[in-house]
């Protein structure tokens, strides 16, 4: 009999069937570039920069911008940001630049142009008869790219936060080396007319190009990154959370994964560490793969590795981390089971550390310390006859080895202990819970637990 089938009767008739549910029809696409071709973008005819500046500035003052014109201008304005490449720059086998080369953001990608003219409305810009200066172009580019960051701020009760961010960014682009080109609050007013621009592929692409450039090249106008920094590791919340997690608990990625006691982690860990990706290469195209269009469905997002994401943030909640308490639970990825494992791992790594002397007054003191430690190790390895030495890690209350933690979970029947629940309630009840957050989940799940 097929193990996936079930048997039952309907009106005395024997029925045998295989229950099937809706599965994820999307295929995760890895960002590795196989053909050694730079990411490309197609835009309209390159504009006259003076005309484009006047038109875009006029549109910003009127809170009415054409996204195609904005993208065409942003690509053309890259000529103002020439910098020196500090080292040979290679990614996925593509030679981007050599050390000492003078480069602009355009060197990172292939920008193709058609003969299609832009709209370039002149209304409202007649007062500017001279050519705009480089600081004026830099200020306009910076303000336009700030629209990307503002459009990425979503969620409830973000009104004041978004306004404050917009005001701070405006202040950056009205002080040296930039110059003031718009009135106060213009950025926020314009954003309201462009609230979804982060979903426009060409605009997102150009924001990623500028960010990748300024993240490596020291430049007078590097503050432009204030609007584009959100393109770095975009749709990588799962991988970023895992990286933050292993640093917090002071383990290597290999050692941390040994504590992931659940079969649903297998596919996610395989997905996160797919060979051939440049996840650990500085200044790689990987960092901006989402904005550069290298992956339609990220294999590194919180939804792609939901069990891992849930576990990491339950551990974070146990440790009282606000970021974890505010994060959104992936409801389809066993949050109840992950909260149990998170409690045990939180207990192991919260309020405890592994310490040893590393600095000494002189070489003799160092040698004496090493000799004393060696003696302690020899004594510890001696079998006292009460417990099989191979099993000591399983039963010792002082060890935090994966085997010991797993044994404690099994001895408790895979259930949280009273102390775990008390800790979860303590951290979540003192936090203003956002809808669907980990804090809300813990409050609803364990607040009424009578254990």
UniProtKB/Swiss-Prot annotation:
Claim: Transmembrane helix is one of the keywords in the record: no
Chief location: virion
Location of Phosphoserine modifications: 389
Subcellular location, record wording: Virion; Host cytoplasm
InterPro entries: Rhabdo_ncapsid (IPR000448), Rhabdovirus_ncapsid_C (IPR023331), Rhabdovirus_ncapsid_N (IPR023330), Rhabdovirus_nucleoprotein-like (IPR035961)
Highest taxon, organism lineage: Viruses
Cellular component GO terms, alphabetical: helical viral capsid; host cell cytoplasm; ribonucleoprotein complex; viral nucleocapsid
Record PTM text: Phosphorylated by host CK2. Unphosphorylated protein N seems to have a better affinity for leader viral promoter encapsidation. Phosphorylation of protein N in ribonucleocapsid may stabilize the interaction with protein P, thereby playing an important role in viral transcription/replication.
UniProt keyword terms in alphabetical order: Capsid protein, Helical capsid protein, Host cytoplasm, Phosphoprotein, Ribonucleoprotein, RNA-binding, Superantigen, Viral nucleoprotein, Virion
GO molecular function: RNA binding
Family recorded in the similarity comment: Belongs to the lyssavirus nucleocapsid protein family.
Subunit structure: Homomultimerizes to form the nucleocapsid. Binds to viral genomic RNA. In nucleocapsid, binds protein P and thereby positions the polymerase on the template. Protein P acts as a chaperone on free protein N to prevent it from aggregation before encapsidating genomic RNA.
Miscellaneous information on this protein: Displays a superantigen activity in human and mouse, activating mostly V-beta-8 subtypes of T-cell receptor.
Functional note: Encapsidates the genome in a ratio of one protein N per nine ribonucleotides, protecting it from nucleases. If expressed without protein P it binds non-specifically RNA and therefore can bind it's own mRNA. Interaction with protein P abolishes any non-specific RNA binding, and prevents phosphorylation. The soluble N-P complex encapsidates specifically the genomic RNA, with protein N protecting the genome like a pearl necklace. The encapsidated genomic RNA is termed the nucleocapsid (NC) and serves as template for viral transcription and replication.
The protein, known as: Nucleoprotein
UniProt organism field: Irkut virus (IRKV)
